[in-house]
């Protein structure tokens, strides 16, 4: 074995040792996107780390501010509502399926609803539908409450006249 093969082999071994640490693996996962506590716990256990190591890693990340379910839920709700145009009902179901606490879900959705202006988004969307009923059905399927749909449609119709 020559020097270059030996160096390559040792570099690979060193890289494997570094990624075997649960904190390094968790930081690697958090580098790509914000994750929820349960989601990260599941991924670490799936990777084969012991329960004590997983809990210690999660506590460390919480203390350092890298892991915050409230912030993650808010960002998730904001993205789903603004980019994918999902309503609160669908976002609530998705967050529940990710294992987020009920109180955190409600606060995140309220905060996201305050920040998003659906009227501008839906004005552009209205041109795709023949009539008001089609748009209403579309919004209901996307998870909007009937009262919110009526409010939005009345504002859109009132703004055009």
UniProtKB/Swiss-Prot annotation:
The keyword Ligase does not apply. Its main location: cytoplasm. Pfam families: RecX_HTH1, RecX_HTH2. Keywords: Cytoplasm. The keyword Nucleotidyltransferase does not apply. It is found in: Cytoplasm. GO terms for biological process: regulation of DNA repair. Transmembrane segments: none annotated. GO terms for cellular component: cytoplasm. It comes from the Bacteria. InterPro entries: RecX_HTH_1st (IPR053926), RecX_HTH_2nd (IPR053924), Regulatory_RecX (IPR003783), WH-like_DNA-bd_sf (IPR036388). Belongs to the RecX family. HAMAP family: RecX. Modulates RecA activity. This is Regulatory protein RecX. It comes from Thermotoga petrophila (strain ATCC BAA-488 / DSM 13995 / JCM 10881 / RKU-1).
């Amino acid at each position: 074995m020559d020097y270059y093969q030996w160096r390559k082999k040792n570099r690979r071994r060193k890289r494997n040792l570094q990624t075997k640490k649960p904190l390094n693996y968790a930081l690697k996962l958090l580098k790509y996107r914000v994750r929820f506590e349960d989601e990260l716990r599941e991924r670490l256990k799936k990777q084969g780390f012991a329960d004590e190591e997983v809990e210690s890693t999660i506590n460390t990340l919480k203390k350092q501010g890298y892991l915050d379910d409230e912030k993650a839920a808010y960002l998730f709700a904001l993205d789903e509502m603004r980019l994918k145009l999902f309503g609160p009902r669908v976002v609530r179901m998705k967050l529940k399926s990710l294992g987020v606490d009920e109180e955190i879900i409600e606060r995140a959705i309220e905060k996201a609803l305050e920040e998003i202006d659906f009227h501008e988004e839906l004005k552009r969307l209205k041109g795709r539908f023949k009539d008001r009923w089609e748009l209403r059905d579309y919004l209901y399927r996307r998870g909007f409450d009937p009262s919110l749909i009526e409010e939005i449609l009345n504002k859109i119709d009132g703004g055009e006249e």
